[in-house]
Amino acid sequence: MHTFLSKTPPLRDYISKKKSLLNITEIANELPKLLLTNNVQNKINKLKVNELSVDILLKNKSEKEINLAMSHLSFIAHAFMWGGNKPEKILPEVISKPWVKLSKYLGRPPILSYASYCLDNWYKVNKKEPISLDNVALINNFLGGVDEDWFVTIHVCIEDAAGDAIDAAYKLSRLNESNNVDDFNTNLKKILTSLKNVNNIFSKMPE
């Protein structure tokens, strides 16, 4: 394991061309405007029960598409519950049904988790360039402000920077008294360098 980020960036769009997935994408993309105008609940309440279905993704077991849908629906669900003048007590079946299905498949509760908010919610502005604070943006957000995006993209970069430490720690766990001391030192130095890079990124959080 090198990092908690996927080896390739998360999907920004569904490969499967189903109307329900287009509906999910449209609502997720519109969340900043829907929240600003207090129209999230109105938008969702007009939908029929299966208009946000993810059954095709579960049937195909398309992992990256499933992660994208989990992120989309998590944002939509939280926006519905908390985006009005007062918190909603009931989440409509049109959201809860597909959300719970995805949650059961992934083995985690239906909530906007760190995975859906950060690990599966980024892309590189320039695909040819490495992950950096100047080259990472969010797929989904609530209001789309600088503070919201910056807080999450910093965590993406931290996860990337910590990758060498995770890799070195794993290699250290495989060493024993028969290994050369240089093997230990090399990996310990990698951990130190990695953590210094992580702390440097952390220091930019207030910016």
Regions found by a protein language model. Give the residues of each.
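Long, hydrophobic, amphipathic alpha-helical segments used as structural scaffolds
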Residues: G84, A169, S173-N180, N199-P206
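Charge-rich, low-complexity segments
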Residues: L35-K46
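Intrinsically disordered, low-structural-confidence terminal and linker regions
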Residues: M1-L35
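Short, charged/polar, low-complexity loop and linker segments
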Residues: D134-V152, A168-L175, N179, T186
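Hydrophobic faces of stable alpha-helices that mediate helix-helix packing
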Residues: H155-A169, L195
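Non-transmembrane, amphipathic alpha-helical segments
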Residues: L57-E65, V146-C157, N180-K190
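Extended amphipathic alpha-helical segments with heptad-repeat/coiled-coil character used for oligomerization
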Residues: N185-E207
